[in-house]
Amino acid sequence: MKIVVLAGGRSTERNVSISSGYRITNALRQKGQQATFIDLFLGYDLEGKTVEQVFDDANTSKDLNISDAILTDEDINKLRPDGSTQLFGPNVMAICKAADIVFLALHGGDGENGKVQAVFDINGVKYTGSGPLASGITMNKVFSKEVMLYHGIQTSGFKEFKRDQGPKQTVPFDFPVVVKPTSGGSSVGTHIIHNQEELESGLEDVFRFDNSAIVEEFTPGREFSLGVVNGHAYSAIEIKVRSGWYDFKHKFQAGYTDFITPPKDLDEDVHQAMKDVAVQTMDVLGLQNYGRIDFFANEKGVWVIEANNLPGMTPLSLLPQEAEADGVDYGDLVMDIVNGKLKLYADGMTEAGLLTK
């Protein structure tokens, strides 16, 4: 198959996305697929090639390390030689239209909030992951929490603040609380807040990345994550940071966090409850093909932190580790994702197909 692995783009999670994209591309080529890496925002200079010839080259780097630098839109705009700020870079759409399917390795921003998915649906381009409606709801932590609560899924209390309200706010919860961008990921802009002064500075930082902030009650407990691929929940992975909390550095730089799968001393009933809730959360949010659900577990049960509709696929990402613990290697995982979504297309069961029936 001809497969475009679409990554990069204009997002604070750009560097994570590129690392995911390189690894996915290399794995697909090892599986005999004509996979090529394309940066959504920077595009591809054909340099005399035909679109078909693009698939002859992986177009990847051997460097999978992730910089801890958080790029702003202004930083990323400077990377594009033509000075354009259009979402799709040169030749991206033409190359994607020539593919049998596009593997979305985008994280955050327009790649995860449904905009790219909507453009592809309009243009008849097949892609992995969920459709635009489910992606938009899931990317917005306020919307997704409201959907989860409506369906009886336990999640921490929360309150939303908008940028135009300013940072001088009070919250209806006791400290500590967690402050994060409403539509962010990879813990960019996320803070654990212990007092009113920290709340104001935390909101100021969040508003650098998003027009909306979500403040959540702090939920103590053990932290877990479960991947769901084609309706099947993998075994949980427990996340144990060696110091501090599970921020960007702890997620993507080696040596800061221990990932334990299967988790030790976890009651099987609790483990099964997390699996059931993970599948239920995917279902109520309308997520398809694959995703990841993050949890806290304590004496009061399991609490969904958030859902991830395009989870990371880097060397330290959780979903590949969970799959490997269940006997599914990285190459088989990416092929399961591709084949699972192609089956949904064939059965007319994608979001676009269901909405037009």
UniProtKB/Swiss-Prot annotation:
Record: residues binding ATP: 172-225
Subcellular location: Cytoplasm
Entry GO MF terms: ATP binding; D-alanine-D-alanine ligase activity; metal ion binding
Catalytic activity: 2 D-alanine + ATP = D-alanyl-D-alanine + ADP + phosphate + H(+)
Enzymatic class: ligase
Cofactor binding annotation: Binds 2 magnesium or manganese ions per subunit.
Highest taxon listed in the record's lineage: Bacteria
Domain ATP-grasp: 145-339
EC numbers, comma separated: 6.3.2.4
Entry's Gene Ontology cellular component terms: cytoplasm
InterPro entries to which the protein is assigned, alphabetical: ATP-grasp, ATP_grasp_subdomain_1, D-Ala_lig_Van_CS, D_ala_D_ala, Dala_Dala_lig_C, Dala_Dala_lig_N, PreATP-grasp_dom_sf
Pfam families: Dala_Dala_lig_C, Dala_Dala_lig_N
UniProtKB keywords: ATP-binding, Cell shape, Cell wall biogenesis/degradation, Cytoplasm, Ligase, Magnesium, Manganese, Metal-binding, Nucleotide-binding, Peptidoglycan synthesis
Cofactor(s) demanded: Mg(2+); Mn(2+)
Pathway assignment: Cell wall biogenesis; peptidoglycan biosynthesis
Binding site for Mg(2+) 1: D294, E306
One Gene Ontology biological process: regulation of cell shape
Chain positions recorded as Mg(2+) 2 binding sites: E306, N308
Family: Belongs to the D-alanine--D-alanine ligase family.
Protein's name according to its UniProt entry: D-alanine--D-alanine ligase
Provenance organism: Lacticaseibacillus paracasei (strain ATCC 334 / BCRC 17002 / CCUG 31169 / CIP 107868 / KCTC 3260 / NRRL B-441)
